[in-house]
Amino acid sequence: MMSKKLYIKTYGCQMNVYDSVKMQDLLYPFGYEPTENIEEAAVIILNTCHIREKAAEKTYSELGRIKKLQDTRTKQGLSSAIIVVAGCVAQAEGEEIFTRTPYVDIVVGPQSYYNLPELISKVVRHEKHLIDLDFVEEAKFDQLPEQLYPQGTSAFISVQEGCDKFCTFCVVPYTRGAEFSRNVEQVYREALKVVSSGAKEIMLLGQNVNAYHGKGPADKIFSLADLLKHLAQIPNLERLRYITSHPIDMNDDLIKLHGTEPKLMPFLHLPVQSGSNKILKAMNRKHDREYYFDIINRLREARPAIVLSSDFIVGFPGETDEDFEDTLDLVRRVKYGQCYSFKYSPRPGTPGATKTDQIPEHIKSERLTILQQELMAQQLAFNESCVGSTMKVLFDRNGKCDDQIIGKTPYMQSVYIQNPNKSLLGKIVDIKITKASLNSLTGEILVSHV
């Protein structure tokens, strides 16, 4: 079969990265091979994010650039590429995408992209403006192909999708649907596959991954803790992680597992969004700051070395200076290793967008600057505390310099070392940390590994 080129540009979360890999796997049997050169692509897929307005508008900006590429092809007498908008912008905006960008051929949601081969074949037969936004989570997981392209040393596996929490700022329940978990056998089989292909580390993915409740042997329902213990038995799998978690789903078994399972890394992303009880209630987060502090304390009791990460939103409607100070207070009390912070972005269709007490943009910007200064200071302090220590680093990619490779610590810090023959790629190695910056560490190979 003559190969055709497939170009995928991915926006947003790790789930989208995973979905893009699965799209490659879906289309490979039909003769489509991935390319990083958009100009040679027969099919162009934008796998999109709708979590913030800026992310959504990036899709339309990129589509404008693709339109110019299509026009150039036409002038040169070349065939046009098939253009697909996939992911959460597709789910949220649907037919509006065809109105704004009529040259798009296919709009497909995150729960129905397994139909891409059929949709693309219809476009080849000159059908236009095809759309599939069905919410059938069971069908998606049942239709996902087995891995064809190795993910490398670190692999993502989707185990849970959707969200039932309905935070008032968030589009996920509307774009990804209700919470649904893959069955244990599917997850275990995929984990065996990626490990046999060379993965040393697996990151389990879900919008609310710690709400996982998949069906296991004898129809037993497995919690996330059960699933992690099951996967930890796989030979040659050395590291396990999971993302993203909701505080209210951090149950006792999962917290205890952080203290008993050595393959479960001592790093947890646990978004809190705000430190103000008033704002947490307005966000419909279903917990208060005291509950969050209790979870953090219990995690640190179970595993004293655990390092935490979080998400924060500043400028949610009704946020006062006092509310913002509560957020700063929470940050200073918890002390994070790294964090992500954003200005509130009203999303159409969410309750937050209809609130009348929106915060002026300049105040959002001021608060974000103050918060990020605090978070960056904490991140730098944590990185600097690692200097002089020996850390186990999983090397997974080349650096920008010819003799450089990059790995990550158990705490998700990037570590740069000199390794001219690249002999340590794919290995976990003891590295002495010699230097720290805000975003990375520098290290040296211990004599025993030379």
Swiss-Prot record:
Its EC number is 2.8.4.3. Pfam families: Radical_SAM, TRAM, UPF0004. Residues 149-381 form the Radical SAM core domain. It comes from the Bacteria. Its cofactor is [4Fe-4S] cluster. It is found in: Cytoplasm. Keywords: 4Fe-4S, Cytoplasm, Iron, Iron-sulfur, Metal-binding, S-adenosyl-L-methionine, Transferase, tRNA processing. GO terms for cellular component: cytosol. Residues 4-125 form the MTTase N-terminal domain. [4Fe-4S] cluster 2 binds at residues 163, 167, 170. NCBIfam families: miaB-methiolase (TIGR01574), MiaB/RimO family radical SAM methylthiotransferase (TIGR00089). Belongs to the methylthiotransferase family. MiaB subfamily. This is tRNA-2-methylthio-N(6)-dimethylallyladenosine synthase.
